[in-house]
């Protein structure tokens, strides 16, 4: 997940106990989409996202924290159960390398429960190979909706390390077909546009009203050595189950299968999915917060 199992409290959420989204599609929860596996608690809330054995993070709703590699970030939700932000700090010192920093992320939604903005800021200082460094970074994404569909995403990333500046920006446009998304299910393609796989379990607001069939991303990056521009596009098609859930999504012709677990309050199915492989790997807080830094 370029995870967004996280959230930092805003003023409106200070007195609320984190609940988290518990959304089902035709009485089922997505258990696997492509290489991503989703783990749920007894209240049908997603507690973990994995990519094969790689664990992006685990959420403790009772404590209101996300746990990444035994570290905690505070988490909260708005009244609809959608993630509203993240804040955390880190301090590592090992084998001559040291990193001390902090980061904050916030999400906002419109009155229809659709994600409209994502902002991120972080700063860090430390030593690598005996050399000191300091860096700051910011990232902002804005989302434009029309007729219930996400049609455009604009991002801008800026970072500075020891006075050297880096900038990255992109504009992504999304096209839709005539097939209605009757269950309001997030697709893998749309989650990729958001750069956050948590969208697949409804943690980031409502999905588009129709199934997206393509997106085109124009992007640039520049620093002291380059000024680069390029374009990238993907096409999506779908095969649905009889209950209108997605069975297979094809992205540029490659199939991504969807698996589900039926909701049964008397079953241990959801608990069983919480078991982790012995070779699991974890994303730490620092890796998550500096992923938008243009560090070399």
PLM-predicted stretches and their roles:
Residues 5-8:
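C-terminal motif of bacterial Sec signal peptides marking the signal peptidase cleavage site
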Residues 11-296:
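Buried hydrophobic residues that stabilize the cores of well-folded domains
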């Amino acid at each position: 997940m370029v995870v967004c199992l996280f959230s930092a409290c805003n003023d409106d959420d200070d007195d609320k106990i984190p609940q988290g989204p518990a959304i089902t599609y035709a009485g089922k929860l997505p258990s696997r989409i492509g290489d991503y596996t989703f783990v749920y608690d007894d209240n049908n809330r997603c507690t973990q996202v994995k990519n094969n054995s790689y664990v992006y993070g685990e959420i403790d709703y009772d404590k209101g924290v996300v746990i990444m590699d035994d570290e905690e970030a505070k988490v909260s939700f708005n009244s609809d159960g959608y993630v509203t932000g993240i804040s955390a700090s880190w301090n590592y010192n090992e084998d001559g390398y040291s990193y001390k920093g902090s980061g904050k992320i916030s999400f906002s939604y419109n009155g229809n429960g659709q994600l409209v903005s994502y902002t991120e800021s972080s700063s860090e200082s430390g030593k690598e190979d005996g050399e000191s460094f300091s860096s700051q970074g910011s990232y902002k994404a804005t989302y434009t909706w029309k007729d219930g569909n996400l049609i455009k995403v604009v991002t801008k990333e800026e970072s500075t390390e020891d006075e050297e500046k880096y900038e990255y920006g992109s504009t992504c446009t999304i096209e839709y077909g005539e097939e209605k998304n009757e269950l309001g299910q997030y697709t893998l393609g749309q989650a990729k546009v958001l750069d956050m796989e948590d969208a697949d379990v409804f943690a980031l607001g409502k999905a588009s009203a129709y199934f997206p069939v393509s997106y085109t991303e124009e992007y640039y990056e520049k620093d002291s050595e380059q000024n680069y521009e390029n374009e990238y596009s993907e096409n999506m098609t779908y095969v649905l189950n009889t209950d209108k859930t997605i069975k297979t999504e094809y992205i540029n012709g490659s199939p991504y299968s969807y698996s589900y677990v039926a909701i049964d309050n008397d079953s241990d199915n959801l608990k069983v999915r919480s078991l982790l492989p012995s070779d699991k790997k974890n994303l730490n807080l620092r890796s998550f917060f500096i992923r938008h830094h243009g560090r070399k």
